[in-house]
């Protein structure tokens, strides 16, 4: 794999944690996160709402933005969230977490968006 270009120590630590995991999905996520900031995806809530199923765990290797509404109960993990998206996620009784927290929980069925 390429060397990490990020100078953010939190992201560097997350990439190292993901690389140590045995599952292929975590290694894929490490590659996506190690991209430059402008090449990481930004995903709107409307897109997540359209493609996700209730009860699902979604990971965004970038930022979650607030455009649209969320009417399903899902768990969203991302590197960052806009303040408005956090409010909308809370109002829909869904849950949002940093990717590092989700990795520690070791979820079984996850989907990567973006």
Predicted regions and their residues:
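Extended polybasic, low-complexity segments that bind anionic RNA or targeting/receptor surfaces
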Residues: 1-114
């Amino acid at each position: 794999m390429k060397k990490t270009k990020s100078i953010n120590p939190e992201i560097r630590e997350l990439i190292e944690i993901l690389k140590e995991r045995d599952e292929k999905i975590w290694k894929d996520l490490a590659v996506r996160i190690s991209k430059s900031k402008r090449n990481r995806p930004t995903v709107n809530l409307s897109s997540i709402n359209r493609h996700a199923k209730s009860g699902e765990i979604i990971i965004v290797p970038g930022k979650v933005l607030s455009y649209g509404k969320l009417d399903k109960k899902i768990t969203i993990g991302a590197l960052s969230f806009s303040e408005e998206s956090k409010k909308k996620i809370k109002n829909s009784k869904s849950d949002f977490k940093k990717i590092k927290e989700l990795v520690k929980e070791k979820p079984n069925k996850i989907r990567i968006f973006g």
